[in-house]
Each structure stands twice: as structure tokens, then as C-alpha cells.
Amino acid sequence: MELAQTLSQRQTMQMAGQMLHSLAILGMSSQDLSEHLTEQATSNPFLTYRAPPAFIARGGEDFDAVGAVAAHKPSLMAHVVDQIEMAFTETPDRLLALRFAEALEPSGWLGQSLDSIALAAGVSLSRAESMLAVLQGFEPTGLFARDLSDCLILQAREADILTWEVETLIRNIRLIAENRLSDLADLCDCDIGDIPEIIKQIRHLNPKPGLAFDHQPTPVFPPDLIAVRGAEGWTVELNRATSPTITVREDRFADGTADAKARAERRRRGRGPGAGEALERRGDTLLRTAAVLVARQSAFLDKGPAHLVPLTLEDVASELGLHASTISRAVSGRMIQTQTRALPLRAFFSRAVSTQGGGEAVSRDSLDFVQRTVGGEDRQNPLSDDAIVTLAERAGLRIARRTVAKYRSTLGLASSYERRRAAAAR
């Protein structure tokens, strides 16, 4: 009886350990997973790790998976997408932020004008400017700068050295390159002997913060999944180019060995199949989750963000018979490649707001309502947030006042007091 109980406890502990391992692997990015499997294969002679084809393509036949992982730096896009997911909860915000991220040059500067980004995203210039202000607060400071001067001014402000003289020199940085110290002194209205010290402060700044990240010729953020539009709808598959494999080397294990080292290796060998099974479960969960997202949001893929339908983590978890936290791990940091662009899986989720008819409308509709309402108001008598709430109710949308304020902020719209003051100043 006691022996049976002990065995049962051991089995329970083993199952719990395997479950935790599976959950940990599910939450890993492709790069983190490769690092984890490389470490396992390095410490266990019975395991063979095979890097994803995307990694092998970086180094050709002599590619060293261990060395590559050790030398790995996160890509600029991966770094930025992580911050986007933390900074924004609304899908429209994330999609707009992703548009900006796609416009980044290796230097970390924007490679497109604000006008072109706003046009491509289908938003107003004021909203694009509001989004840029948030993105320029990302780390490292200087990302999303529009040019060299913009980059250096952002960093000087953070370093608390942005005096009038420093800003003047930065905005006339061409004169520094030409060593025209006298002209710079005239612009700054200071002694020429003060200029070298100001230049020294500027030279401590980083003109190209994006270069601290990995810029291999492979995609900066390889998608984990691929969605294809066919005659009968959308289909989803795993991106095998980013899928690693791990196998047990039976030929390296010989029965009959009895020394302590061999017994220790036998125990390590027992963990081999667990890693392989966890990998399979990870791929299966990713694929099933993505299939539900694509099926539910096919109109979003076909027609754009305005056609998102309400969908939460709990909805997907219920359909798959999984816990919401498992779905959260599955979608965190994951990208899916469509025929036009790569999207984060979290872009497929959208919260709902109540309508007077008892149904639900996606929050994008409320966002658009606020934008249209403020855009069409009398400039001399701008609408208060309470007035917008009342108009929304008449239109069949139930939006809280604090939600209106949040949407205004998202759209880059000022308060009614500030809009009235701006109109009076014209």
C-alpha cells in the first residue's frame, strides 16, 4: 500500500513537471526555444538538436547552432513588437504601431514620412503624430526618430542636457561636421571657446540606436505561422522554417553499462522524449489557436480592422477546451504571415461594447464613432465627452465617459476645452 502510494506520488510529480515544461515551451519564442533546446542537447549526449531551416540559412553548411544562440542579439522588430504588446491593449492601436515598426530602418529611424504612414494605415495625421509621440518613448531612446537631429534631441532630452545651446547645435549639425565653430558660436550667442564642450556632450549620444540589434539578412521577425487565402477560404499552417526538432539518439546508448556516469546519462536520456512531446504539443496548440482566430476573423483579413468581430482569449479557450492562460501563452509574441503582411496574433482579438439592442459591437466601431463625431462638430462649440456619450447612445452604442476620453487620446484628439481654445486662437 505504502509502495503504491509512493509510486503514485512520483508519477504525479513527473506529470506536473512535464506539464510545466510544456507550458514553458509553449510560451517561448522561436529564438528562445532554439536556445533552450540547444542547451538541452549540449548537456545530454542522447539528444540531437536540429536548428530550424531559417537559422541554418544564416550560416550555410557549417552553421553552429550553439555558437549562433550564444551570439544571438534580438532583432529590432522583435524588440519593438514586445514593447508594442505591453504599451497597447486595443487592436487598432497595435496595428497602427506595427505600421510604424514596419517603417523602421536598421538605424532605428523611420524610413517613411509621417504622411505616408498615416495614409497607409488609414488614419488622420494627428492620430499618427499622437502614436509617434508614444513610440518615441520606447527603449532605447532614439527609436522612431524622423532624422538624425530628431534622434539626438530625444536622447539629449532624456539625458537632461537639452539646453537651448545643445538643441541649436544639433539642429545645425552640418556645421559641426564642417568644423564651422565661429558660425555655431554666433547661432548660440556664446563664446567660440564654449562650443567644443557642447559638441562633446552631443558626441556621447547614439545617432543610430537600432544598430544595437541583430540585422541578419533573414526576416527581422520570422512568423511562426502562415495563413493562405484559397478558393474555399483561409487555411493556416506552421512555418516549418522556424520550427526546430529534437530527437533521441538510440545509437549512443548501449544497454549493460553499470557505472555511475552511465546511470546518470540514462536518467538524462529519459527526459529526451518529453522534450519532443512538448514540442509537438506546442506546434499543435499554436496551429489550433491560429485556425480559430483566422476562421473567426476572416473578414478582418479580407477587408481590414473595421471588420473585426468581438473575440477574447476566453472565447478561443472555450472553443478549444483549454484554459485562457494557455491561449495567452500561445499568442504572446507570435506572428502570422498573410499574403500581404505579417501580423501579431493578438491583433485578432477585439473586445466588445454593449449596444442598446442587447447585442455587441466591436470597439473599433466606437472608436470610429468618436472620430467622426468630433470631426464633424461645430469648431466654436466643441462637444464634451458627456455629449459624445449621449450621441453614442442615440446611435445605439453604449460607451462610458472614461472610454470616450481614452478613445480621444488614442485618436490624438484634445479635450473640448482645448479644442475650443484652439478654435478661438484661429
Swiss-Prot record:
One of its GO terms (cellular component) is DNA-directed RNA polymerase complex. Residues 257-278 are annotated as: Disordered. Keywords: DNA-binding, DNA-directed RNA polymerase, Nitrogen fixation, Nucleotidyltransferase, Sigma factor, Transcription, Transcription regulation, Transferase. InterPro entries: RNA_pol_sigma_54, RNA_pol_sigma_54_core-bd, RNA_pol_sigma_54_DNA-bd, RpoN_core-bd_sf. A motif (RPON box) lies at residues 400-408. Residues 312-331 bind DNA. It comes from the Bacteria. Gene3D superfamilies: Homeodomain-like, RNA polymerase sigma-54 factor, core-binding domain. GO terms for biological process: DNA-templated transcription initiation; nitrogen fixation. GO terms for molecular function: DNA binding; DNA-binding transcription activator activity; nucleotidyltransferase activity; sigma factor activity. Belongs to the sigma-54 factor family. Sigma factors are initiation factors that promote the attachment of RNA polymerase to specific initiation sites and are then released. This sigma factor is responsible for the expression of the nitrogen fixation genes. The open complex (sigma-54 and core RNA polymerase) serves as the receptor for receipt of the melting signal from the remotely bound activator protein nifA for the expression of the nitrogen fixation proteins. This is RNA polymerase sigma-54 factor. The gene is rpoN.
